[in-house]
């Protein structure tokens, strides 16, 4: 199997070192509006598109902005989509059921389901905070969605599942499942306190300063491996809409 399926390349960091983000790890992307989160998701999808076409990766997309971001992507790449909270609940139930099926089928046989056995299930979530926060009836739905997503994050990696979630809000109230993401990327944020929420104290102490990223540098990003605490600073290449439509 092509090793490229397991890496997302974002060019080079400020020291000229390659920026290689593991594609098989739950990832949280945090950044203000206009900070360039689309460059991160676009780069991820561009890298994975050949493997989606080969049936080695299966993309599900939740975009609670009515599909305005995901709608730019070649629809042939999307297995299932959800543009509303109610649709997201249905998708998450089906996704969680598939995780259970894989656990039952492969328990005692393998420790990790790999793409040559079953397609990697890539769940991309745009505006993830809107999935976990709600008012009135939506609050009940958001609570259910959070529980389902928690189940997927906890059990999913061994079953060949990767969740990539994007949010503007790093606060725990908005992203209660933040600890479930061992890999973090932060674009422009408002303050050091937001950076510590998004990336953790170790990353900031090791030099990550996303609150200093200029507003006119979209795609500029700090990447943190939460296990090692290592940080890299880079600017993700811009992926235009025409490229997304023709992937």
Predicted regions and their residues:
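Conserved P-loop NTPase motor module
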Residues: 179-185, 215-247
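A generic fold-level signal
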Residues: 54, 116-117, 216
